[in-house]
Amino acid sequence: MSETRKLAAILVADVVGYSRLAGADEDRILARLRALRSDLIDPTIVVHHGRIVKRTGDGSLIEFRSVVDAVRCAIEVQTGLIERNAGLPAERRIEFRVGIHLGDVV
């Protein structure tokens, strides 16, 4: 059986220090993450033609047709997070660690 392969950019993101943040105030961090996803992250993914492949508790795996779209999406989300974190103490900031890979997917 032949596998169909395609070139894709895969963006993986997770919250830096999620366990620490959740340990301090789990209800608040979950509410903030839901708001970030609905107000910033998910719309930005759509604008840059991404498709959410999988969500984990504190992260996501997202497929893009173009590495340029993946990088632009990551920059826009990170910029939005900087704006939303302004004025918050460091221990309450939600920050994402992001990696992008370009290669064949099945």
Task: Report residues per predicted region.
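Cross-kingdom TIR/SEFIR domain
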Residues: 78, 90-93
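Short amphipathic alpha-helical interaction patches enriched in hydrophobic/aromatic residues
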Residues: 19-22, 85, 106
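Catalytic NTP-binding/metal-coordinating core of nucleotidyl cyclase/transferase enzymes
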Residues: 1-76, 80
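A short glycine-enriched loop-to-beta-strand structural element that forms part of the catalytic core
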Residues: 92-106
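Active-site phosphate-binding and catalytic loops of NTP-dependent enzymes
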Residues: 82-90
